[in-house]
């Protein structure tokens, strides 16, 4: 099979009221995977001329000859044709580059002019388009294209000898959906909120994770859903499918078909069509995620979670997690004294997903 990834991006940064960075980039890379006599070989090329592509094929075959036999890894036998809706996921708009530059300058200058803000050390505006195509020798043709417009800013605030820095970002499908004023106000508010923060006494607290920190915590332990980790013997959840592992009020889905999210995926890296999958259902582990190889190993079906880049080998990966709403009201959730967690450090050094 062949993966072709391509992309274009515009990146802008401002400093002290002037444009500091104006960067336009484009890329294209081919990633080939061959299976010969049960052995897998991969190779890639950033050039598209016939000589470069012929060399890529030859290199993949050579690499396969030195690889061990992979009993369960196969090329998809599907001949489906899949394509995302460009009008939905890669819409165009009439915003000019000059207007995007004005947005970038305004974002930095407005935040720099807020009360107690010493400077805006980090900020940026990006307009990114990405495309992926997956082809197989069995006739599969899968194509996706998406656009993401981004803006972010960090403020350094200072009062006397005390300072603090916080940042925030926005993402949208079209540039007019970005709102510099809203971003500036929220970044300023968040930074002022921690300016005079002090350690709290050590004891047990009720805590609420904000949207950012909650996602970070779940990401640290995402490998618990990996069928590849289970196949490799390093997933403690391998034999717990169907068992209770969490509070019965917790249901976690991987929902790649949710178009409001930027993890939308019509198909995975093998070209397998994706679908919504329950990972934790009312506290019980409902499923692991599989590509075709891990699915074959466990005698089950692929869940449409194959991951592979043009330069990498076959793995598994989540698309976009969704936690279903609980039954408690917002007022009851926030009753009493609690801590809201807005920033986490040391997650990977302080957490062991294997144990």
Regions found by a protein language model. Give the residues of each.
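Active-site bordering "gate/hinge" segments
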Residues: 1-275, 281-284
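Dual-mode signal for accessory low-complexity, basic/Gly-rich regions
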Residues: 240-355
